[in-house]
């Protein structure tokens, strides 16, 4: 008995945590999927209604607006974060004197929550007290920067704030990847007469495919579940012009008493995350098997 207890002690210790996670994470994921197929309104109902909630979801103009905003936000957020991250990591990879200080500055935004980031950028982008007022006070009276209150441009203010917060983290990922590359490869390329630009473009960056993939997956995950930054910065406005799926889901569940519709939108978001993560995990496992 003592031998069995000693052998299985790690399993016994983690089993309560495992059970809690299994119930409160995966159990509620399954519950959400089930509720999305019911007539649930203010309170959950368990009478099966087929895919009517999903039909209602995809016939809702506000949901289409949220999905369109998500596509705009995701493309710009991922591309700009990776470009800035690569440029900053290459800069720091040159062994400059102020590397430690600059690395701290670039990474500092990641220490803030998206709520703090959204609030700070809301102040800066406010036409009556932010960048626009500062520039007009300098004498440039024709200058306008009212994206925060513009229905057409408000989604781009979310992109600006999100890129500011996340690009430093991407820089850290790429810098770690650059520092893991053997210096002999770079020295050999320089001996062959390759310029620094061609070394990075044709040799180093292609070797960093795992970093690219990891960065893309992380950024896609952040963009799909974007909620707190949107609420703090624009609250989905003006009107619903900067709505995102997570904001739509919360509004339907807690303000419109549409639990079934909110569950359908949550199911769509979850399936989107799976569509991003599963192929990545599959490709990484295949690559590891090939290397072994």
Language-model regions, residue ranges each:
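A structural signal for multi-pass alpha-helical bundles of membrane permease subunits
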Residues: 3-292
């Amino acid at each position: 008995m003592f031998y069995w207890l000693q052998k299985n002690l790690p399993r016994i210790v983690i089993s309560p945590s495992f059970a809690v996670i299994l119930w409160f994470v995966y159990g509620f994921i399954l519950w959400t999927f089930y509720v999305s197929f019911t007539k649930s309104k203010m309170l959950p109902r368990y009478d099966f209604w087929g895919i009517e909630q999903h039909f209602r979801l995809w016939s809702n103009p506000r949901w289409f607006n949220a999905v369109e905003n998500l596509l705009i936000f995701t493309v710009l957020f991922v591309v700009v974060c990776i470009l800035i991250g690569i440029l900053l990591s290459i800069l720091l990879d040159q062994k400059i004197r102020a590397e430690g200080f600059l690395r701290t500055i670039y990474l500092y935004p990641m220490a803030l929550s998206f709520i703090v980031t959204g609030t700070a950028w809301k102040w800066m982008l406010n036409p009556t007290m932010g960048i626009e007022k500062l520039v007009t006070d300098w004498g440039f009276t024709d200058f306008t920067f009212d994206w925060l209150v513009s229905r057409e441009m408000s989604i781009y203010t979310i992109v600006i704030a999100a890129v500011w917060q996340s690009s430093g983290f991407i820089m850290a990922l790429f810098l770690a990847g650059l520092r893991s590359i053997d210096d002999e490869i770079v020295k050999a390329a320089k001996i062959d007469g390759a310029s620094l630009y061609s070394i990075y473009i044709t040799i180093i960056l292609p070797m960093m495919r795992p970093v690219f993939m990891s960065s893309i997956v992380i950024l896609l995950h952040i963009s799909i579940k974007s909620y707190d930054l949107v609420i703090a910065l624009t609250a989905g406005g003006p009107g619903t012009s900067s709505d995102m799926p997570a904001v739509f889901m919360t509004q339907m569940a807690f303000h419109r008493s549409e639990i079934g519709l909110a569950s359908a939108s949550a199911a769509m978001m979850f399936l989107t995350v799976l569509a991003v993560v599963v192929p990545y995990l599959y490709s990484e496992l295949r690559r590891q098997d090939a290397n072994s």
